[in-house]
Amino acid sequence: MATATSGTGKTKVAVIGSGNIGTDLMIKILRTSEVLEIAAMVGIDAESDGLARARRLKVATTHEGIDGLLRMPEFDDIEIVFDATSAGAHARNDELLRARGRRVIDLTPAAIGPYVVPPVNLDAHLDAPNINMVTCGGQATIPIVAAVNAVTPVAYAEIVASIASKSAGPGTRANIDEFTETTASAIEKVGGAARGKAIIVLNPAEPPLVMRDTVYCLIGASDQATQDAVVASVTRMVDRVREYVPGYRLKQQVQIEEASADDPLRQLAPDGSEPAKVTVFLEVTGAAHYLPAYAGNLDIMTSAALRAGERLAQTLTQREGATA
């Protein structure tokens, strides 16, 4: 289908899911995007705050889910749909949208399409009908794994994502198992680690703490030149993520130490190597567009999805112009 743009030249999109993530994404599009225009907000609870806020902001809404979206007059002009529902609901949403030629950006752990982490592999998947934004923990940590792997192979990577309990809505809590499985898989497929593991911690502390992530990478070289190159690569990657998530930062300097002889992780390193452990501590503060600043886990997810949506829209518009 031809790219549908508004009178301002923006590509029209819809958001399915009127919870925390969907609502924050809607507001980001409204306030910050020079490329996208939100044409519809979709939920299943007519009284949800997300739909109520959308109505106040003059965004067309439906509380009848995907079926309601397909019946909306605005649907004909929508080119890209962001799905912020759940892994279970996404399969049907994707089937119906793909059959109608819409591109889908999946913010659930369903992972029907390829995993996408913008600074690592977005451009490689711009032709995919469905792309998956992994998880909040994945968006925060996989760029670091990829940065280390760009210098020297990562034999094992483990990430620990600690988020404020208050920032985890019912969707996040219902998908905890999918979170760990999806993130671990993407650590390998996108980050490049030979083996990956993910752990999520819901921190009940009051007042709520911002998102904090720890990334451990086991590498097969501990010489100074490799260490210096790893630190430089990680620093560059942090700067790239900060382009679209300003609250993303290194909490401490990158730490690299030789793996001791009795370290159980040493057996995962290549035979004959002098393995080292790279440890990176991250902190993510949210932009507070809709959610509190401590909800950096949600902010990095919606910011990554927005980045992907804008890049996809630009690509579609360029191709349309080239064939006009």
UniProtKB/Swiss-Prot annotation:
GO terms for molecular function: acetaldehyde dehydrogenase (acetylating) activity; NAD binding. InterPro entries: Acetaldehyde_dehydrogenase, Acetylaldehyde_DH_C, NAD(P)-bd_dom_sf, Semialdehyde_DH_NAD-bd. Disulfide bonds: none annotated. Transmembrane segments: none annotated. The keyword Kinase does not apply. It comes from the Bacteria. It catalyses: acetaldehyde + NAD(+) + CoA = acetyl-CoA + NADH + H(+). GO terms for biological process: catabolic process. Keywords: Aromatic hydrocarbons catabolism, NAD, Oxidoreductase. Its EC number is 1.2.1.10. NAD(+) binds at S18, G19, N20, I21, S167, A168, G169, P170, G171, T172, R173, A174, N175, N297. The active site is at C136 (acyl-thioester intermediate). The keyword NAD applies. Belongs to the acetaldehyde dehydrogenase family. This is Acetaldehyde dehydrogenase 1.
